[in-house]
């Protein structure tokens, strides 16, 4: 049975009033598919793994055969009808707590929290829960449901006055005084673990970071001393020496930043992602992305997959101070031998999550050369930055045709049309030009600055902003000017651009113009975001006095 929408309608007569937000306990989407339940193991003979790519920030309630609520313990992979089941890493709230935030984790490849996101939870009157679930960044992820034990079916209503339901060790009594929920031991002093605590069903376990192992007490960690101990923490080969040891990777793989894990090399370009997988890993397998029409191409030694940020099922999301683009490479046995001579297979399935991260905050520079004598003004050529923006100089206020090869000719006080343009037009994102300032040199930290935009507000009355159909593009008009002094013959523009999720009502982009008097109000502050400076020019231009 497909999910259905339960809505409560509110009719008000008389004078107009402000809109009333519906209580999520009475306005939610039911998730009732049997395959969501934690008892449902993935059987690909009955169909491909499932994915919650339709989930997109709405409120949901688990009902029917899906279960009563989300599990609060680690679910093994290949359950809930998918490869990477998603569970709630935290206890359910009480009714008086209102809406709370919890971490949701996806289990895969032996890691109970290989991927995580933040969801919202509310306890409703009647003893059930509703969840505001975010869209997973990659497939195959599914939010799981679970049937919790009933301690005594006859224990209901006033029976609590005469007797008390008791739950098994590792579980606690729920707000309905009847259901036994899993106890999250990790919420109390991290379960006594010195590093990582993983909540399990009716229990928990301690884990250690890469290159470290548990001591005999099962709670504290120690450094790996050599290859004889857990292979040195290396995912593949461990090479010992008199001075210690180091991890090595098979040909075609690269060592990740933790210096212990080997991974497939991924090239994050400004408008595309490229994955090169050694053929030894994929012999006999056919590789494809989330959109199965996007497939790998073999060059004899590697299988190459090239895809853009808005095709092949790529999911682009804003996570903290980064823009994250994700996809999943899946390898399944070929139906017939390939032209490259693959007659055998050594694995039944290959799954490679692919992620590229880009900073949210950018500083983009562009320059021009003003002429005091009202003779032609030459605009410096544009400079590309890293994903996702460039600063373009346009020919008119239609902002459709930027100057490409031929430089424009302008005079002082003529109109200069410039704009922030995304390299790739990705839906679900929006931008805010937080500041734009001019300098007489290409240095961003130049002492002499003239602000056109500051704190998201136009600070020069001569600046005009135009509306754009694209949430990421911003267009402006300003009269051409120069700095005082005969030596100041160049002007450079620098713009700080911030990227946000278009549905995030508390983001810095949603706040817009942010005067200093408003700082400290609720919502996101871009001061804590990691920024990246994109250098541009200058291109030297002959100057005639």
UniProtKB/Swiss-Prot annotation:
PROSITE patterns: ASX_HYDROXYL (PS00010), EGF_CA (PS01187), ZP_2 (PS51034). One of its GO terms (molecular function) is calcium ion binding. This is Oncoprotein-induced transcript 3 protein. Glycans are attached at residues 89, 116, 291, 299. The lineage of its organism: Eukaryota, Metazoa, Chordata, Craniata, Vertebrata. Residues 261-516 form the ZP domain. One of its GO terms (biological process) is renal system process. PANTHER family: ENDOGLIN/TGF-BETA RECEPTOR TYPE III, ONCOPROTEIN-INDUCED TRANSCRIPT 3 PROTEIN. Its main location: nucleus.
